[in-house]
C-alpha cells in the first residue's frame, strides 16, 4: 500500500509526516525546513508562490500575499487576485499541493492519500472545507482528525498504563483543550472545548499595535496606513515574541521603515518580556474558559489530570506555561516537540488505516451539539457535544400546521437554546407528506456523524416511506462541480509550475554547456582542428539564438547538438592528454635508467649517493 501522508494544516505553519519503520518521520520542505509556512502569494507577473518563497516576498508584495487563511475556512470569504476570486479551500489546497509535491520528492514515490488534522472545535462547515481542500490538492482524505487527539497519539504511542491526559493546543489561529483517557492502546476523548479565533496571531496583533502606537507617539507617523511597513512590523513582532520566550529583552530594529518630508525614519525599540506579557495578558486570559469547560464536561477536577501536553508554537511562551501550571498545579510535559507532534500523530493514524500500526483504537468526539430548528425557533438537540464518534441518532418529529405537505429541516450546530444563535449547517425539504392535522404525520430525522466528524442528515416520513437524505449544502460548502473545477485548476497550476521548473533547468543546462564550450575553445589551443573549433562556435551561437526564443524544444535540440559536438571534442582532448601522459611516463623511465647506469660505475655499489660519511668521537660525560 502507498504511503499515507499525515498533515497538520496550520494557520501560520504546516507540517507533514509519514510512518517509517513503525515510527513517524517529519517530512522536510524542498527548502530544507521542517515546516511549511502557510502562505500563498501571487507575483505581479502572475506567478504563484507557496510556502517559504511566498513568506520571503511578503514585505514587498503585501497586497497579493495571503496569510492565516485557515481562519476563514468554512466561511463565504473570498480572496480576489487579478479579477479572479479564490475560496479558502483553494488557497489551502495550494499549501497542501506544495506539501504533497515536497513529500513525494522526499520519499521518491507518488502520494495520493492523506490524514489531515483540524482544530477540535472546528464545526462541520470547517471540517468539510478542509476535506474539500485536500480533494482539490489531489489527495484522497482518508480521515480528518482533531489536532489535540493527533498530538496525544504521537505522545502516547509507546506509553503503557491508564492515564488521563489534557492536550492544550494553542496554535497560530486556534485554541483547543481536549481531555482524554489513554490506556492499553485505546485513546478515548472525554471532552473537548476551544476557540477557533484565538491564537498566536492575536498576540502578534497586540505587539504590532503597541509598536505602531509608540512609533506614532515618537514621530507622528501612523504605520498602520502603510501596508508594506505593517508587513515588516508583523514579521518583527513574531520574531520578538519568539525571542522573548528565551530572553528577557529584545531589540526591534527596522531601518527605513517609512519616510516624511524630513527624510527616512527608522524604528528602533527595546521590548521586554514583562511588556510582552502585559500586552498579551488579555489573550492569555481567554484560555481559561475553554480549560474550565473541558474539565467540567469530562466530569473531572484539575488535580485528576495525570499529564499535560502542550501543542503549538505559542505554548513555548513562559506566560502560557505559567498559566497552565497555576491552573492545574503541575508541570506540563516537555518530551515532545509542540510544533511537530500533530503531524506525527496524523501519520500514526494513517499507519492505523494502512494496517502498519496495530493495537491502537482512537475514540474521538464531536465538539459541538447538533440538532434542528423546531417550532418557536427552538434549537432541539439530537446529538450532544462530546459524544463519541462515529455515531447515529434518530428522533421522530411532526408537522406544525394542519394539512402541511412539506417540512423544512434546518440543521444547526452549537450550544445556544435558540436556533438563530447557532451555526447553520444547511437546510433541506421533505415533500409529499399526505395532508393531515398537525401532530399526526410521523417524520423521523436521523443524524449520522462519520469518523471524520462530518455530518449526514436524513428525514423520512414513516407513513409513506418517503425520505430525503442530504449532504449539507450550506452556502460555504462547495458542490461537486465546484470541486471538480478547482481540482482541474490545481492540476493546471501544478503543470504550469512543472513547466516553469523544466524551463529553468533547461536554461541552466544550456548556460552551463555554453560556459564549458567557451572554456574548452580557450584552453584547447592546437589540440583540436579548425573544423572542430568552427563546429563548437556555430553550435554555441545556435544555442544562444534558441535561448532568445524561449522555446524549450528548440533549446533542448540546440543543447543536444552542441553536447554531441562537445563530446567529440572531449574525446579528442582526452586522447591528446593520454598521449601526452604516456610520453611523459616514457621520458621519466628513460631518465631513471640513465641515472641507474651512472650509479653502477661508482666505487660503492648500492650506496645511496645522497648519504655523506662522517667521522665521530665518543665523549664520556662523567670525565
From Swiss-Prot:
Does the record's keyword annotation contain Chaperone? yes
**Where are stretches of biased composition, namely Acidic residues?**
614-623
**Where is the sequence biased in composition, kind Low complexity?**
582-603
Enumerate the UniProt keywords alphabetically.
Answer: ATP-binding, Chaperone, Nucleotide-binding
GO molecular function annotation: ATP binding; ATP-dependent protein folding chaperone; unfolded protein binding
Specify the superkingdom.
Archaea
Q: Where is this region: Disordered?
A: 582-623
Keyword Chaperone assigned to the entry: answer is yes
Instruction: Give start-end of the signal peptide.
Output: none
Pfam families per the record?
HSP70 (PF00012)
Cysteine pairings via disulfide bonds: none
Query: Which InterPro entries is this protein grouped with?
Result: ATPase_NBD, Chaperone_DnaK, Heat_shock_70_CS, HSP70_C_sf, HSP70_peptide-bd_sf, Hsp_70_fam
Q: Which residues form a coiled coil?
A: none
Q: Could you say which protein family the record assigns here?
A: Belongs to the heat shock protein 70 family.
Check the record and name the HAMAP family matching this protein.
DnaK (MF_00332)
The function of this protein is: Acts as a chaperone.
The record's listing under PANTHER family reads: HEAT SHOCK PROTEIN 70KDA
Q: What is this protein called?
A: Chaperone protein DnaK
Lineage, broadest ranks? Archaea, Methanobacteriati, Methanobacteriota, Stenosarchaea group, Methanomicrobia
- Gene name, per UniProt, is dnaK
Amino acid at each position: 500500500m502507498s504511503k499515507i501522508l499525515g498533515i497538520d494544516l496550520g494557520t501560520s505553519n504546516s507540517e507533514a509526516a509519514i510512518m517509517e519503520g513503525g515510527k513517524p518521520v517529519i517530512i522536510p520542505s524542498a527548502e530544507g525546513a521542517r515546516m511549511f509556512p502557510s502562505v500563498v502569494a501571487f507575483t505581479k507577473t502572475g506567478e504563484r508562490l507557496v510556502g517559504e518563497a511566498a513568506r520571503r516576498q511578503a514585505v514587498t508584495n503585501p497586497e497579493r500575499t495571503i496569510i492565516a487563511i485557515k481562519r476563514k475556512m468554512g466561511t463565504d470569504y473570498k480572496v480576489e487576485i487579478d479579477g479572479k476570486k479564490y475560496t479558502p479551500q483553494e488557497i489551502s489546497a495550494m499549501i497542501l499541493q506544495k506539501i504533497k509535491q515536497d513529500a513525494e520528492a522526499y520519499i521518491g514515490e507518488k502520494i495520493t492519500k492523506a490524514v489531515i488534522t483540524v482544530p477540535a472545535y472546528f464545526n462541520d462547515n470547517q471540517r468539510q472545507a478542509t476535506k474539500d481542500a485536500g480533494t482539490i490538492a489531489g489527495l484522497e482524505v482518508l480521515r480528518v482528525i482533531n489536532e489535540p487527539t493527533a498530538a496525544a497519539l504521537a505522545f502516547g504511542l509507546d506509553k503503557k498504563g491508564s492515564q488521563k491526559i489534557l492536550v492544550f493546543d494553542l496554535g497560530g489561529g486556534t485554541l483547543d483543550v481536549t481531555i482524554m483517557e489513554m490506556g492499553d492502546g485505546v485513546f478515548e476523548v472525554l471532552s473537548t472545548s476551544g476557540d477557533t479565533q484565538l491564537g498566536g496571531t492575536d498576540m502578534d496583533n497586540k505587539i504590532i499595535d503597541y509598536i505602531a502606537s509608540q512609533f506614532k507617539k515618537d514621530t507622528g507617523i501612523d504605520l498602520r496606513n502603510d501596508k508594506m511597513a505593517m508587513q515588516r512590523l508583523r514579521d518583527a513582532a513574531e520574531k520578538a515574541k519568539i525571542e522573548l520566550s528565551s530572553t528577557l529583552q529584545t531589540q526591534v530594529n527596522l531601518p527605513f521603515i517609512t519616510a516624511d518630508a524630513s527624510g527616512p525614519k527608522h524604528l528602533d525599540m527595546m521590548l521586554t518580556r514583562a511588556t510582552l506579557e502585559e500586552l498579551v495578558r488579555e489573550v492569555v486570559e481567554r484560555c481559561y474558559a475553554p480549560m474550565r469547560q473541558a474539565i467540567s464536561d469530562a466530569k473531572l477536577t484539575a488535580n485528576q489530570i495525570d499529564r499535560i501536553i502542550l501543542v503549538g508554537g505559542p505554548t513555548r511562551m513562559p506566560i502560557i506555561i505559567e498559566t497552565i501550571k497555576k491552573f492545574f498545579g503541575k508541570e506540563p510535559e516537555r518530551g515532545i516537540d509542540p510544533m511537530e507532534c500533530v503531524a506525527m500523530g496524523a501519520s500514526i493514524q494513517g499507519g492505523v488505516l494502512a494496517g502498519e500500526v496495530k493495537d491502537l483504537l482512537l475514540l474521538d468526539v464531536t465538539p459541538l451539539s447538533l440538532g434542528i430548528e423546531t417550532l418557536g425557533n427552538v434549537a432541539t438537540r439530537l446529538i450532544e457535544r462530546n459524544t463519541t464518534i462515529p455515531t447515529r441518532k434518530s428522533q421522530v418529529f411532526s408537522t406544525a400546521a394542519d394539512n402541511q405537505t412539506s417540512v423544512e429541516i434546518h440543521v444547526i450546530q452549537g450550544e445556544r437554546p435558540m436556533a438563530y444563535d447557532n451555526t447553520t449547517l444547511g437546510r433541506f425539504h421533505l415533500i409529499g407528506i399526505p395532508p393531515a392535522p398537525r401532530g399526526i404525520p410521523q417524520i423521523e430525522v436521523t443524524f449520522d456523524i462519520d469518523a471524520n466528524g462530518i455530518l449526514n442528515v436524513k428525514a423520512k416520513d414513516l407513513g409513506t416511506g418517503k425520505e430525503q437524505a442530504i449532504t449539507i449544502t450550506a452556502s460555504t460548502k462547495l458542490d461537486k462541480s465546484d470541486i471538480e473545477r478547482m481540482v482541474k485548476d490545481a492540476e493546471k497550476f501544478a503543470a504550469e509550475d512543472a513547466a516553469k521548473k523544466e524551463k529553468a533547468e533547461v536554461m541552466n543546462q544550456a548556460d552551463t554547456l555554453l560556459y564549458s564550450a567557451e572554456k574548452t575553445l580557450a584552453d584547447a589551443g592546437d589540440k583540436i582542428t579548425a573544423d572542430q573549433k568552427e563546429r563548437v562556435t556555430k553550435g554555441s551561437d545556435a544555442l544562444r539564438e534558441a535561448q532568445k526564443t524561449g522555446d524549450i524544444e528548440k533549446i533542448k535540440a540546440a543543447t543536444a547538438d552542441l553536447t554531441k559536438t562537445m563530446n567529440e571534442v572531449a574525446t579528442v582532448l582526452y586522447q591528446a592528454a593520454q598521449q601526452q601522459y604516456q610520453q611523459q611516463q616514457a621520458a621519466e623511465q628513460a631518465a631513471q635508467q640513465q641515472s641507474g647506469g651512472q650509479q653502477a660505475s661508482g666505487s660503492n655499489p648500492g650506496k645511496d649517493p645522497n648519504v655523506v660519511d662522517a667521522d665521530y668521537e665518543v665523549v664520556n660525560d662523567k670525565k
